[in-house]
Regions:
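N-terminal auxiliary segments of SAM/dcSAM-dependent transferases
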Residues: 1-30
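Conserved alpha-helix/loop element of class I SAM-dependent methyltransferases that forms part
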Residues: 39-40, 54-71
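Class I SAM-dependent methyltransferase SAM/SAH-binding core
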Residues: 76, 82-129
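A short acidic, Gly/Pro-enriched loop at the edge of an enzyme's catalytic core
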Residues: 128-140
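A short SAM/SAH-binding and catalytic strip from SAM-dependent methyltransferases
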Residues: 139-150
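A short glycine-rich, Lys/Arg-flanked "PGG" loop and its adjoining helix->strand segment in the class I
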Residues: 153-165
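Conserved beta-strand signature within the Rossmann-like core of class I S-adenosyl-L-methionine
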Residues: 167-173
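Conserved Class I S-adenosyl-L-methionine
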Residues: 202-262
Length: 262
């Protein structure tokens, strides 16, 4: 992984700005690697329609956000991407208010065009300087996003600022052990208390394997031949560096919940 923070952020922004232009499909709503839920989670948090396109990417949001019991709460997603996750949360879990911010203008434009959900709003914004008042939200979601931020410690300080007392950050991401340790340190320094920390690597690996035929078919159909290898790496397909590093334990995909004391 690229360790220079500014370069890493610029590379991710370039990727996220380019992706919608090459894959403008209105029904391609998600960019996460997907999640294969356990039977226990299906029982505890309910099932979703497993016939839907990209349902495992939808499941990543469902089994993260459902833990927040967001009904009648105000929810912010930082790094809302193509908007499918926030739309699922808004339509299925029915928060009082759902707002997404993303630093990629093309992603926000895609959301405005394809997600006309009355309770969801999409804005262009900076995760390190969020355009919101103090204590404005009950829940902050962050899905496979903050590893790309130039200043993750500042992002977590901003999360703590915009959360109400008793509110919580619900985050999933992929990184190596040393990088997770830094995130835990920055979380504590921001004044957030780690409440849940779960390794979900196997669930993600299984989702990647099961979704391989669909991803390959889409890439073959829409991506020029000379770019397919790059897109397979970006999508985390079977055989990609990310997939192999997840399988061999070099990096971990984790779900954390961090609470602002109230």
């Amino acid at each position: 992984m690229v360790r220079q923070p500014r370069l890493r952020e610029r590379l991710w922004k370039l990727a996220y700005e380019t992706f919608p232009k090459i894959l403008p499909d209105a029904n391609w709503w998600f960019m996460n690697y997907g999640y294969e839920p356990s039977d226990a989670e299906r029982y505890q948090f309910g099932t979703i329609d497993e016939t839907q396109f990209q349902w495992r990417s939808r499941a990543m949001y469902h089994y993260l956000a459902a833990r927040a019991m967001p009904e009648a709460k105000e929810v912010l997603e930082v790094g809302s991407g193509r908007g499918g996750g926030l739309r699922h949360v808004a339509e299925t879990l029915k928060p009082k208010r759902a707002v997404g911010i993303d630093f990629a203008a093309s992603a926000v434009k895609f959301c405005h065009k394809n997600h006309r959900v009355s309770s969801a709003t999409y804005l262009e914004g900076n995760a390190m300087a969020m355009p919101f008042a103090d204590a404005e939200f009950d829940v902050v979601l962050n899905v496979e996003s903050c590893h790309a931020y130039f200043d993750q410690a500042q992002f977590l300080r901003e999360v703590a600022r915009v959360l109400r007392p008793g509110g919580a950050l619900y985050l999933v991401d992929v990184r190596a052990d040393w990088n997770w340790d830094l995130l835990y340190q920055w979380t504590a320094e921001a004044g957030l208390k780690l409440h849940e920390n779960t390794d979900i690597t196997l669930n993600v690996v299984r989702a990647i394997e099961l979704d391989e035929p669909v991803k390959n078919a889409l890439i073959k159909k829409r991506v020029p031949f000379w770019l397919r290898g790059v897109f397979k790496e970006f999508a985390g397909n079977v055989g990609s560096q990310l997939y192999e590093r997840l399988r061999n334990g070099e990096i971990q995909y984790r779900r954390i919940v961090a609470v602002k004391p109230g």
